[in-house]
């Protein structure tokens, strides 16, 4: 029923009251405009974007599967990143420990080389190779001296046991001759301590006679 029909059936307004009542009747008969409903949210999931031809239930299940796969991938990447960080930290710690051990080892070597240099007479070398060469030569000399002393001990020519010869003077010519005789006796006697005792006794008797 339109506004033209309502105007035909209602009498023409004769006053302001009738005009107002006429307008109220028109407004009461005019259908009230319904408020427009808000548009539905169009939340399209990633599954609906990639699979538009799939039905609603199937789309939801596929979207859940994709979301779960993404979470698993993120967890795997996070775990792998943590493992890489731990390995890197472990390598850094091992490198620092190795450097510290190497530094201590070099310090000990330098200390030992300085101590060895003090034992070698007239050693003025600074590099390690030259210092070791000097140490080898010095040890060879010491070894030769030890062998020489061993041979002298075997022959009874130990300098520690040989009597000291005083300077030749007119007053001690006889004593010098006696000591020479004692030395010849010591060289001719067997290698034992008895000749030394005998020579000492002879020296004592000679001194007594003088």
Swiss-Prot record:
Main location (coarse class): nucleus
For the bHLH domain, which residue ranges apply? Answer: 93-142
An example GO BP is:
fruit dehiscence
Which InterPro entries does its entry note?
Answer: bHLH_ALC-like_plant, bHLH_dom, HLH_DNA-bd_sf, PIF1-like_bHLH
Query: Which Gene Ontology terms of cellular component type are present?
Result: nucleus
Keyword terms of this UniProt record: DNA-binding, Nucleus, Transcription, Transcription regulation
- Tissue-level expression: Expressed constitutively in roots, leaves, stems, and flowers. Confined to the valve margins of the silique.
GO-annotated molecular function: DNA binding; DNA-binding transcription factor activity; protein dimerization activity
Q: Where is the composition biased (Polar residues)?
A: 27-48
Name residues in a coiled coil: none
Q: Where in the cell is it found?
A: Nucleus
Record Pfam families: HLH (PF00010)
Region entry Disordered, spans: 1-49
Keyword field contains Nucleus: yes
Q: According to its UniProt entry, what is the function of this protein?
A: Required for the dehiscence of fruit, especially for the separation of the valve cells from the replum. Promotes the differentiation of a strip of labile nonlignified cells sandwiched between layers of lignified cells.
Its quaternary organisation is: Homodimer.
| Protein name per Swiss-Prot or TrEMBL | Transcription factor ALC
């Amino acid at each position: 029923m339109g506004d033209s029909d309502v105007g035909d059936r209602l009498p023409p307004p004769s006053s302001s009251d009738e005009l107002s009542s006429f307008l109220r009747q028109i407004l009461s008969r005019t259908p009230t405009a319904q408020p427009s409903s808000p548009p539905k949210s169009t939340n399209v999931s990633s599954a609906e974007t990639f699979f538009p031809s799939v039905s609603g239930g199937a789309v939801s299940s596929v979207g859940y599967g994709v979301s779960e796969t993404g979470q698993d991938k993120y967890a795997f990447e996070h775990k792998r990143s943590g493992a890489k960080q731990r390995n890197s930290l472990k390598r850094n710690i091992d490198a620092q420990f190795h450097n510290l051990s190497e530094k201590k080892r070099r310090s000990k070597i330098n200390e030992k080389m300085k101590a060895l240099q003090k034992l070698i007479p007239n050693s003025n070398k600074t590099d390690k190779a030259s210092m070791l060469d000097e140490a080898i030569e010095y040890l060879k000399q010491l070894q030769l001296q030890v062998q020489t002393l061993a041979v002298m001990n075997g022959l009874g020519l130990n300098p520690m046991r040989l009597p000291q010869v005083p300077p030749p003077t007119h007053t001690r010519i006889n004593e010098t001759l006696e000591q020479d005789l004692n030395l010849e006796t010591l060289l001719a006697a067997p290698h034992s301590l008895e000749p030394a005792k005998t020579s000492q006794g002879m020296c004592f008797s000679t001194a007594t006679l003088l």
